[in-house]
Design a protein with these regions (language model features):
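A broadly tuned "polar low-complexity/structure-edge" signature
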Residues: 2-3, 34
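Short alpha-helical segments used as structural interaction elements across diverse proteins
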Residues: 8-10, 29, 79
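Sec/Tat signal peptide C-region and signal peptidase I cleavage site
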Residues: 27-33
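Flexible loop/hinge segments at secondary-structure junctions
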Residues: 33-156
C-alpha cells in the first residue's frame, strides 16, 4: 500500500512539474501581434504592398515602388521580433529564412538586409535615413518621425 501511495505521489509531482514547465514556456513565447512596416516621415513612400516588401526583404529588389533606392533593416537572426516579421511576411519560420539567406550569400547572389541590435536602434536609423525601411511590433506614435506603410497581420 505504501509503495502504491509513493508511486502515485511521484506521478503527481512529475505531472505537476511538467505542467508548470509547459505554462512557463507558453508565457515566454512572444504574443501574436501585427508587425508595422515603417519608413521615415521624409520618405517619398506612402504605402507598400506585401509583395513589394517581400521583394525587398528577400533580396529580389533594392528599390521602393517609386524607383528610389531602398535600404531594408532587420533585427538579429534569433530575435523574436524578426521571427514574427518573417512569419507574417512570408509564412515561413525563421530557420527557413536563415537557410534561404545562407544559400544566397554563399552563392554570392545578394546580401541580406542589414541587421541592427534592437528595435530601438532600428527606429533611430530609419528616422534618420530617407532610404530606410524597417519594422516594429508596436504601432509607432505619430511624433516618432516614422510613417507606417504596411501592417502585416499575424498569421497565428
Amino acid at each position: 500500500m505504501a509503495a502504491a501511495s509513493s508511486s502515485l505521489t511521484m506521478r503527481r509531482r512529475v505531472l505537476g512539474a511538467a505542467l508548470l514547465t509547459l505554462c512557463l514556456s507558453a508565457a515566454a513565447l512572444p504574443a501574436r501581434a501585427d508587425v508595422f512596416v515603417v519608413v521615415p516621415i521624409a520618405s517619398t513612400v506612402k504605402a507598400m504592398t506585401q509583395k513589394e516588401l517581400l521583394d525587398l526583404y528577400m533580396g529580389r529588389s533594392r528599390a521602393f515602388p517609386d524607383g528610389t533606392f531602398a535600404l531594408p533593416f532587420d533585427l538579429p537572426r534569433d530575435a523574436p521580433g524578426r521571427a514574427a516579421f518573417y512569419r507574417a511576411l512570408t509564412g515561413m519560420e525563421l530557420a527557413q529564412i536563415n537557410s534561404y539567406w545562407s544559400r544566397l550569400m554563399f552563392s554570392g547572389q545578394t546580401l541580406p538586409p542589414q541587421p541592427l541590435p534592437t528595435e530601438a536602434a532600428m527606429v533611430e536609423l530609419v528616422k534618420r535615413n530617407p532610404s530606410a525601411v524597417g519594422y516594429v511590433l508596436q504601432e509607432p506614435a505619430a511624433d516618432k518621425g516614422l510613417r507606417v506603410v504596411l501592417v502585416l497581420k499575424s498569421s497565428k
